[in-house]
Amino acid sequence: MAKEDMIEVEGTVVETLPNAMFKVELENGHQVLATVSGKIRMHYIRILPGDKVTVELSPYDLTRGRITYRFK
């Protein structure tokens, strides 16, 4: 899948789950299950509940996503 096909939305981390998974509440009120992208994992960027993040969603499954950026 091409990167242009991904849907980028902002949200807030609600809960941390095992295996680097997070429950993220999007700005529109929906909750998605998100994992950490490789670059964030590689640079040891910590993500905690309450952090504002950018999530990439696939148009095929809008319930799962990938965290690509954590706002400071």
Curated annotation (Swiss-Prot):
CDD domains: S1_IF1 (cd04451)
Top-level lineage group: Bacteria
SUPFAM superfamilies: Nucleic acid-binding proteins
GO CC, one annotated term: cytosol
All residue ranges annotated as the S1-like domain in the record: 1-72
Subcellular location: Cytoplasm
Keyword Transcription regulation: no
GO molecular function terms attached to this record: ribosome binding; rRNA binding; translation initiation factor activity
SMART domains: S1 (SM00316)
Family of this protein: Belongs to the IF-1 family.
Known role: One of the essential components for the initiation of protein synthesis. Stabilizes the binding of IF-2 and IF-3 on the 30S subunit to which N-formylmethionyl-tRNA(fMet) subsequently binds. Helps modulate mRNA selection, yielding the 30S pre-initiation complex (PIC). Upon addition of the 50S ribosomal subunit IF-1, IF-2 and IF-3 are released leaving the mature 70S translation initiation complex.
NCBIfam families linked to this entry: infA
Entry-linked PANTHER family: TRANSLATION INITIATION FACTOR IF-1, CHLOROPLASTIC
Subunit relationships: Component of the 30S ribosomal translation pre-initiation complex which assembles on the 30S ribosome in the order IF-2 and IF-3, IF-1 and N-formylmethionyl-tRNA(fMet); mRNA recruitment can occur at any time during PIC assembly.
Protein name: Translation initiation factor IF-1
Native source species: Enterococcus faecalis (strain ATCC 700802 / V583)
